[in-house]
Amino acid sequence: MADTLQNLMAAFNGESNASAKYAVYSEKAKADGYLAVAALFAAASNAESLHAARHARVIKSLGGEAKAEIGTYVGKDIQDMLKEAIAGETEEFTEMYPGFIAEAEAAGQKAAVASFKGAMEAEIVHAKLYTEALNNLDAWKAKRSFFVCTICGWTEADNAPEKCPICNVPSDKFAEF
């Protein structure tokens, strides 16, 4: 359980920092005229804060206290922000979360497994959307909407799904960005 608690705390810190960073990146993308990229970063910032909150609830249930050390973030060139976001999200779903899930499963920590898996699935979508933006930046200047499940943080482009693919809540539980 100690490893699972440490992993939850690391994930909480990471998701909290990603949320803060993406909020800054959203403002920079908007200022640079990339409205769809700005909306995506805003949606992802919200999703990351939801992941952090879910991790925090599990941390508390295990007797821990969720604490994050939030870094200072500044906007960069649009391509650099997207590349950094892709790298971070990819590391989470290819390395960090699979390892955390394996350890939590071995420890029988079902709530931690669910929290890690939900975040991991959303990170896959974030990386895909960031990659789409990077590969076709001009198309991402126009306004575009993104929808975030307010329960688990799943993110969808253009329209909310009928049901969340992670937690199965209906489309009215999605917030638009």
Language-model features: locations:
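Non-heme di-metal
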Residues: 1-177
